[in-house]
Amino acid sequence: QAAPVLDHIQRLFEELNAFLKVNKSPDYSFLYDQVVSYGELLSTTIIHLYLQHKGIQNQWLDARTTVKTDDYYRGANLDWKRTQEAILASVSKNELVITQGFIGSDANNFTTTLGREGSDYSAAIFAFALNAVSVTIWKDVAGVLNGDPRVFEDTVLLHQISYREAIELAFYGASVIHPKTLQPLQRKEIPLFVRSFENPTAMGTAVSKGKTLEPHVPCYIVKKDQVLLRLSSLDFSFIVEDNISDIFALLHQYKMRVELIQ
């Protein structure tokens, strides 16, 4: 029974090896996306074949054929119109679909990745396109906590939280959910459940419209390895909009994320 699985895996490795032999691009971000995407392709292939072996019929879908993006590698921006059309044309609501998170493709069909927490974002993308009833994301924590349990003692599970509160927490650095994941769900008011795969019967955290932070506790976020960049003009004049635009263009060019401006 192992032979078909190994054959599929071998073909993926051969595909990757063929790309590496002909690749001439010096762009690290481009090369990164072409290579790391194979982790998702390999793992979903194994799951797909395992379920087939157990008699559970399912459709293996290459997310690169449906999630369409620009060519901003390692943090690609979604083409929502093309993506929705491709998903609706490829996914049957009556089938179990096994697909990848984190990856897509650009207009030239080169692989792209969606950045930090891109797999969760992929789930939200498919949910948005398919008008899903809800989305459940399985994590190694009980749900959304009011602080990082590796830093703070006696952290509290947030049972219910609104989209706005979850986006605010995520924006300021809470790592369980990424703001990009929440935005498409909020637009269609699709509830999000964050649950623990270590305790699958526990309810975890529910994120939905109109839910207030429950219980009412303060939330703490710690960011490590931050860099403070202080800018001033040589002629002591104010930094105005044109200067700020130039600064952010450079930061964007070098894929540097700004956490706070003062």
Model-inferred region functions:
Residues 54, 188, 254:
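Conserved dinucleotide-binding and phosphotransfer motif residues
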Residues 61, 99-101, 138, 195-197, ...:
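Generic beta-strand/beta-sheet core signal
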Residues 1-177, 182:
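Nucleotide/pyrophosphate-binding catalytic subdomain
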Residues 97, 112, 192, 205, ...:
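A broad, low-specificity signal marking well-ordered, structured residues that form hydrophobic/aromatic
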